[in-house]
From Swiss-Prot:
The gene is rpsG. The keyword tRNA-binding applies. One of the primary rRNA binding proteins, it binds directly to 16S rRNA where it nucleates assembly of the head domain of the 30S subunit. Is located at the subunit interface close to the decoding center, probably blocks exit of the E-site tRNA. This is Small ribosomal subunit protein uS7. InterPro entries: Ribosomal_uS7 (IPR000235), Ribosomal_uS7_bac/org-type (IPR005717), Ribosomal_uS7_dom (IPR023798), Ribosomal_uS7_dom_sf (IPR036823). One of its GO terms (biological process) is translation. Gene3D superfamilies: Ribosomal protein S7 domain.
Length: 160
C-alpha cells in the first residue's frame, strides 16, 4: 500500500478567447518555459487559419480533430508468471484527451522539423489532417489500435 496521498487534479481555467478548457489544456501542452502568450498566439493563429480554409468555426474544427485522434483502446504491460503480456484495455476519457493533445503537438513538431514552415502553419495543417482523419496524429492512434487488436488474445488478463 502506498503511503502517499493521491494527487488532486488541478482545475484548469478556460482560455480567454474561446472560453474552452480543452483549448486551455492544448495551450498548456504547447507552452514552453512558461511562455503562455507565445503558445496562445501559435494556437489562435493556427485555428484562425484553419477556420479561414474550411469556413467552419474554429472550435468545431478543433473538437472534431480531437475526437478523431482520441484513442478508445491501448495496450498496457502486465507481468504474469514471469512473462510480460501486452494487455489491451479501454482508455479513460481524460487520458484519451491528453494523448490526443500530445499526439497533435508531436505530429506538428515533427512536420516543423521536416519542412521550413512556421510552427503555426504546421499546427494548422495537422489540425486539418486530424479533422479529415489523416496525418501523423491519426496514424499514432491507428498504431495503438493495431497493437490492441494484435494482442486481443490477452484481454482476459485485464487489470482488476
Amino acid at each position: 500500500m502506498s503511503r502517499r496521498r493521491r494527487a488532486t487534479k488541478r482545475v484548469i481555467s478556460p482560455d480567454s478567447k474561446y472560453n474552452s478548457v480543452l483549448l486551455a489544456r492544448f495551450i498548456n501542452v504547447i507552452m514552453r518555459s512558461g511562455e503562455r502568450s507565445i503558445a496562445e498566439k501559435i494556437v489562435y493563429g493556427a485555428l484562425s487559419k484553419a477556420e479561414s480554409r474550411l469556413g467552419e468555426s474554429a472550435m468545431s474544427i478543433f473538437s472534431a480533430a480531437l475526437n478523431n485522434v482520441m484513442p478508445q483502446m491501448e495496450v498496457r504491460s502486465r507481468r504474469i508468471g514471469g512473462v510480460t503480456y501486452q494487455v489491451p484495455v479501454e482508455v479513460k476519457e481524460d487520458r484519451a484527451v491528453s494523448l490526443a493533445l500530445r499526439w497533435i503537438f508531436k505530429a506538428a513538431a515533427a512536420a516543423r522539423k521536416r519542412s521550413n514552415k512556421m510552427y503555426m502553419d504546421c499546427l494548422c495543417n495537422e489540425l486539418l489532417e486530424a479533422y479529415n482523419k489523416r496525418g501523423g496524429a491519426y496514424k499514432m492512434r491507428e498504431e495503438k489500435y493495431k497493437m490492441a487488436e494484435a494482442n486481443k488474445a490477452f484481454s482476459h488478463f485485464r487489470f482488476n
